[in-house]
Amino acid sequence: MASLNDSHFDLFDLPAQFALDASALDHAYRTVQAQVHPDRFAAAGDAQKRIAMQWATRTNEAYQTLRDPLKRATYLLHLRGIDVGAENNTAMEPAFLMQQMEWRESIEDAAAAKNVDALDALLTELRDEERMRFDKLGALLDSGANQAAGEAVRQLMFIERVASEIGTQIERLEN
């Protein structure tokens, strides 16, 4: 069995890379979870139960991180010594800042006009942009361009927030 301090990738015996076989991750998760699930240790002593709980928690956290592409990229950069620092590093390229303002303006206009179709179209545009940027992020990570990958992660985090705002506006207008 791996150590509690091993990387998420090592825990599931997967290569530490952005591209991930989702079915291999799912299979590895079920395998590890079957070994460490606290129910297997119901008759064990308190110390063994605590360790089993730590392993189960660690396994769940690792799985949740690796199955989400944005969390996986952030974690991979962390392993490479890069702190994405989205909270305190908001510097972004000017073209992306302009795009942000356009998206925000479109959201405000569509919400004010109670135009759900416009919000749906904007959400589709955002999801397309997100897919394209995830492809770019994968290439950056594969090539070792970690600083550029960090900026790409911050941009994707922003896109995710904007998409969530659109979803909230759509829900508000539909209710």
UniProtKB/Swiss-Prot annotation:
User: In the UniProt record, does the keyword Protein biosynthesis occur?
Assistant: no
Function according to Swiss-Prot or TrEMBL:
Co-chaperone involved in the maturation of iron-sulfur cluster-containing proteins. Seems to help targeting proteins to be folded toward HscA.
Q: Which InterPro entries match?
A: DnaJ_domain (IPR001623), HscB (IPR004640), HscB_C_sf (IPR036386), HscB_oligo_C (IPR009073), J_dom_sf (IPR036869)
PANTHER family on file: IRON-SULFUR CLUSTER CO-CHAPERONE PROTEIN HSCB (PTHR14021:SF15)
- Quote the Gene3D superfamilies the UniProt record gives: DnaJ domain, HscB, C-terminal domain
Any Pfam family from its record, for instance, is: HSCB_C
User: In this protein, which residues make up the domain named J?
Assistant: 7-79
Question: What is one GO cellular-component annotation here?
Answer: iron-sulfur cluster transfer complex
Q: Name one GO biological process term.
A: protein folding
Superkingdom assignment: Bacteria
A GO molecular function assigned to this protein is: protein-folding chaperone binding
- How is the subunit organization of this protein annotated in UniProt? Interacts with HscA and stimulates its ATPase activity.
The identity of this protein, by name, is Co-chaperone protein HscB homolog
PROSITE patterns listed in its UniProt record: DNAJ_2
The entry sums up its family as follows: Belongs to the HscB family.
Provide the alphabetized UniProt keywords.
Chaperone
Name the encoding gene, please.
Answer: hscB
